[in-house]
UniProtKB/Swiss-Prot annotation:
Part of the 30S ribosomal subunit. Forms a bridge to the 50S subunit in the 70S ribosome, contacting the 23S rRNA. One of the primary rRNA binding proteins, it binds directly to 16S rRNA where it helps nucleate assembly of the platform of the 30S subunit by binding and bridging several RNA helices of the 16S rRNA. This is Small ribosomal subunit protein uS15. GO terms for molecular function: rRNA binding; structural constituent of ribosome. PROSITE patterns: RIBOSOMAL_S15. Keywords: Ribonucleoprotein, Ribosomal protein, RNA-binding, rRNA-binding. Gene3D superfamilies: 6.10.250.3130, S15/NS1, RNA-binding. The keyword Cytoplasm does not apply. Belongs to the universal ribosomal protein uS15 family. HAMAP family: Ribosomal_uS15_B (MF_01343_B). It comes from Pectobacterium carotovorum subsp. carotovorum (strain PC1).
Length: 89
């Protein structure tokens, strides 16, 4: 199941640069992180759902690519985003 419209709007408001900024790298990474976290809960109940697991791996790969891009372009925004999302230890 995907995120609700309200959850997406809240993420866009929290991480976006403007009110309708849904395309910035930070927003895309935050949305992917929310979907990944949701799917991790799904897999605790449905261990053999390999079809969804493939989608999860695709999302993780896409998030990694976006984070690599952001790290290349603006390290300060990258570190800020990592801290806000709690992705690195």
């Amino acid at each position: 199941m995907s995120l609700s419209v309200e959850a997406k709007a809240k993420i866009v408001a929290d991480f976006g640069r403007g009110t309708n900024d849904s395309g910035s790298t930070e927003v895309q990474v935050a949305l992917l992180t929310a979907q990944i976290n949701h799917l991790q809960g799904h897999f605790s109940e449905h261990k053999k759902d390999h079809h969804s697991r493939r989608g999860l791996l695709r999302m993780v790969s896409q998030r990694r690519k976006l984070l690599d891009y952001l790290k290349r372009k603006d390290v300060a925004r990258y570190t800020s985003l990592i801290e806000r999302l709690g992705l690195r230890r």
